[in-house]
Amino acid sequence: MRWRSLSGHRFFVKSTTMRKHTAVEVAAALVFRNEKLLIARRPSGVHLAGLWEFPGGKREQGESFESCLQREIWEELDCGITVGSLVFKNVHSYSEKTVDIRFYHCKLTQGEPRAIECDALEWITKDQVADYSFPEADVALLEYLDRCPHLWV
């Protein structure tokens, strides 16, 4: 894991072993409220079904990661967000695909999140993270968040 800088912001980059398939680019929202973090459970019938993750999705061609995240949150949660700084980036290879995932600090700006394209939503505290199962691509981020209490406000 190493530090990178982008527009004056520092964030961590974690890279795991790459396999020989094209990376799927993903943007994910870190939405904190009242010392809790929003997570969503992946629906049945999709890759990594039943695991908990951070809301977001695949970036479309020509779309910025920030625009992708705003679109995905409207589609998945029926609410609006402001996308803030990049917090963490990870490239992780699964047997069937590689994901290049970027996690952004976000704020709710319109509506209340609803589980539209996921099985469930939860607001969890830092101490509850271990009670949920997350995809391997999120583990390095979770370790980083454990060391960053200032984000949980």
What positions do the PLM features span?
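The catalytic Nudix box helix
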Residues: 54-86, 125
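Conserved N-terminal beta-strand and adjoining loop/helix that marks the start
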Residues: 16-37, 58
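NUDIX/MutT-family hydrolases
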Residues: 105, 114-145
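A conserved beta-turn-beta hairpin within the catalytic core of GNAT-like acetyltransferases
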Residues: 46-50
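Aromatic (phenylalanine/tyrosine) cluster motif
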Residues: 11-12
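Active-site-adjacent beta-strand/loop module that shapes the phosphate/pyrophosphate-binding cleft
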Residues: 80, 89-112, 122, 145
